[in-house]
């Protein structure tokens, strides 16, 4: 099977940093917002949106040069793109590749949508805490008021 060279899309390789692949199509801008990108310190950020994927049909890809993501950032990304994978790149080579995994408990990343939840009172310094009910698509339940928060409501918090 020959590949038509004119139809290939080339995205420059990064020397060091992170590649987030298999992001749900058209969700990469949410990922950039979660990560606070672009910023003045990050040299290059490359975004490919709605590209063809054999695995998931359509996907987004984000490449971040000279930055490796921490666990909290990966947990946030898991809420938006639960099937994404993360590649750590050093000297142009992938040294670590992991699927993003939604933890069983999420603390402080999103807010409870129940206005009467104790976590939403200014005079109660309690961080929102959620138990993950479903991974694909993400659904969580508030630890305090037991409000179920569906994927759409989670995504709205990152818009």
From Swiss-Prot:
Cofactor note: Binds 1 zinc ion per subunit.
One Gene Ontology MF term: metal ion binding
Descriptive protein name: Aspartate carbamoyltransferase regulatory chain
Cross-referenced PANTHER family: ASPARTATE CARBAMOYLTRANSFERASE REGULATORY CHAIN
Organism listed in the record: Methanobrevibacter smithii (strain ATCC 35061 / DSM 861 / OCM 144 / PS)
InterPro entries assigned to the protein according to its UniProt record, in alphabetical order: Asp_carbamoyltransf_reg_N, Asp_carbamoylTrfase_reg, Asp_carbamoyltrfase_reg_C, Asp_carbatrfase_reg_C_sf, Asp_carbatrfase_reg_N_sf
Keyword Zinc: yes
Cystines in this chain: none
Keywords on record: Metal-binding, Pyrimidine biosynthesis, Zinc
Essential cofactor(s): Zn(2+)
Role summary: Involved in allosteric regulation of aspartate carbamoyltransferase.
NCBIfam families: ATCase_reg
Gene Ontology terms describing biological process: 'de novo' pyrimidine nucleobase biosynthetic process; pyrimidine nucleotide biosynthetic process
